[in-house]
Amino acid sequence: MSLRLNISGVRKSYNGKPVLNACSFSFDRNGVYVLTGSNGSGKSTLLRICALIESPDNGEVIYFSGNNIISKDILLRRRITLVLPGIGLFNTTVFNNAAYGLKIRGGKNKETERKVNNALKFVGLIHKKNHNALTLSSGEIQRLGIARAMAIEPEMLFLDEPTASIDNENTEIVENIILNMKKEGRSKTIIATHDMLQAGRLGDCMLLMDEGKIIKV
C-alpha cells in the first residue's frame, strides 16, 4: 500500500520566531503537491519536518500505510527522501554519487548498478556516469540529486526548490523529469517552490504557505 502523510497542528520556531503556525494537511493522494509562498514562509522547514529531518515543536507528523500508522523508524526513513538545492557531492564519479543512497542501505552490486543506471538515464546523465561529479554544471548537479533519490525508489519524494539557481535549459529538463515521474506514478511528490508559474505547470494540488499555515489554492 502507498504511503499517506498527515500533519496536524505542526508548529516550529527558531530563536523565538514562529515559522510554522499550526500547519495541518493530509497528503493522501498520488501525484504532485506543490507548496508555494514567499521566501521565509516556512516551505523548506515544513519539508524537512515531513521528511523527518527535523522535529516539530508541537503537533503530529503521522505516516500511514492503508489505515495503519507506521513507526518513524529506519524502515520508514528508507521509504522517503528529501532532495535539497545544491546537493552535497563526493569527489568521485557521477555513478558513485548516484549510488550513495543504495550503498548505505546495503544494496547488492548488480541491483545497485541496474537501479542507478536507470535513474541516470531518466535524468539524462547516463553519458556522464564515469565523469567526476565535481565537473558537472549546477543544473546537472541538481539532476544528479534527483537521480540519487530515484535510485532508492522512494514512495514519497520531497523536492526543495528543485530549480533554484539553475539555467532555463536545466529548469525545463528538471520540470520534465518531474512530469515524467508523475506520468509513471513513481512517487508521491511534494515540492516547495516560490515560482507560481512552475507550481501551475507541475502541481496536481497547489498549496500556499501564508503566515506559517497551509492554504489549499
Question: What role is predicted for each listed range?
Answer:
Residues 110-128:
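Conserved ABC ATPase "signature" region
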Residues 132-136, 140:
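Conserved ABC ATPase signature
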Residues 36-38:
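The feature captures the beta-strand-to-loop junction immediately N-terminal to the Walker
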Residues 157-160:
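Catalytic Walker B motif of ABC-type/P-loop ATPase nucleotide-binding domains
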Residues 67-81:
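ABC ATPase NBD coupling module
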Residues 51:
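Helix-to-loop junction immediately C-terminal to a conserved catalytic motif
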Residues 193-194:
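H-loop/switch region of ABC-family ATPase nucleotide-binding domains
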